[in-house]
Amino acid sequence: MNLLKVNDMKILITGTSQGIGKAIAEKFLQNSHEVIGIDRQSSKIDHNNYTHYRLDVRDYANLPEIKNVNILINNAGTQNEDDIDINLKAVIHFTEKYGIQDNIHSVLNIGSASAHTGSEFPEYCASKGGLLAYTKNVAMRVAKFGATCNSLDPGGVMTPLNECVMSDERLWEQIMGETPLKKWATPEEIANWAYFLTVENTFCTGQSIVVDGGESINRKFIWKD
């Protein structure tokens, strides 16, 4: 079966209650895929092809038995004292349980541009940095199935969790001063990248794709007038 010519793949996504995860789920649903979401919050998605499990991604003992997952997207994340457990350990557990099997077409880890710059809280940077190494590990292991594994690493995204940043005029001005494109991504833009990397892409694997409006470049281009 050529998975690129069908739109009935089974997609498992963590962290689908809002923001990036919700946008990714909706993107796949728009393209007629079966989507399964896992989040500790209830879902606002109402669609016949969507199934929601309300549980913590660290609750390994109660994870559902989901067979024949074609695409796994590890999106659930946090920025607190649980960084390592949720952002890294849970990703490893989910991938080993659902992603390393012969029906897999693609694994995508939602990382962070801060993994490349170190410009975040220590535990958060460490968790996302570890994700980069694990992405390469998985890419080597799923290649035998003809599958890919990549990390999609956004910079600023206009999500409800970032409302406190976007509403702080002074902080926002400072951030825009460091961002060449002078804007943040929408969740839908990140969802488009996720769809491309997991469905349309068949050759790029083991890579980290930074989508941050150029912020990580930290460019200082000096040239004569």
Regions found by a protein language model. Name each.
Residues 28, 94, 130, 134-142, ...:
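Hydrophobic alpha-helix immediately C-terminal to the catalytic Tyr-X-X-X-Lys motif of short-chain
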Residues 143, 148, 205-207:
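Short, small/polar-rich loop/turn modules that mediate ligand/substrate recognition or access, typified
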